[in-house]
Amino acid sequence: MKGTAWRAALTGVLIRLVARLVTAPRPVWSGVAPVARQRLYFANHSSHGDFVLIWTTLPPRLRARTRPVAGADYWLASPLRRFLIHDVFKGVLVDRQRKPGQPDPLAVLREALDGGDSLILFPEGTRNTDDKGLLPFKPGLYHLARDYPEVELVPVWIDNLNRVLPKGEVVPLPLLCTLNYGEPLARIEGEDKADFLARAKRALQALAPAGASVPSDPVSPDTAPPDTTHPGSTTPGSTTPANSTPGSATEASGPREGAPND
């Protein structure tokens, strides 16, 4: 047991070192700070390396309690992957091929949240390798946000990683990556699933750098995102502040951590 823990710790150090050498990941915290709060980080998904970068760019005290949500079919396919996801990343595995009658796939995520852990989630559900915008969000984000109102919902835009590790490749290319951490998404009382997921998608798209090819969904006056330009304010009908850390815009420089992968 002690030997496994030692190997996992050393492997984690090596992974963070390689990630920094290859991509020099730069976390930018805007409207949110890297503080010890229970959170659900939701991000765009273009590579198996996505959650590794989030995991790498979280400070150690946050990384220790932040677990990526990942596809069991991929991460259980070999002894090495099992070691990485279980012992190094402490991942939460979900069965993406669930058949009728099988347990609720969100049960393991609820168990992790009930235990006080934060999660890294990719609401698109699979890797998105084109430049046509985000895929439709899966409903899991909505259900977890509804059932755990105390957990902050932090969008994270990962820029450039699809060029560092394209789908099907195993050798990364040395390119710089930026991770934009945005302000927590507010809950709006009575908001239905479709409206919530559309608003979460817009919040994530808004973090994409200028010039990125990320088409926005059409927004009508009735579904426009709430005004969160005033720090500390709440939106009409909201039960959670739109910005839990008013006015903060911080670049964190130490290790940090990540979310769901396939």
Give residue spans per PLM region:
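A charged, well-structured terminal subsegment
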Residues: 106-107, 111, 177-200, 205, ...
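Intrinsically disordered, low-complexity terminal tails and inter-domain linkers enriched
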Residues: 212-261
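Internal catalytic-core helix/loop-beta-alpha segment
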Residues: 92-136
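Residue-level preference for the first positions of well-ordered beta-strands
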Residues: 38-40, 118-122, 154
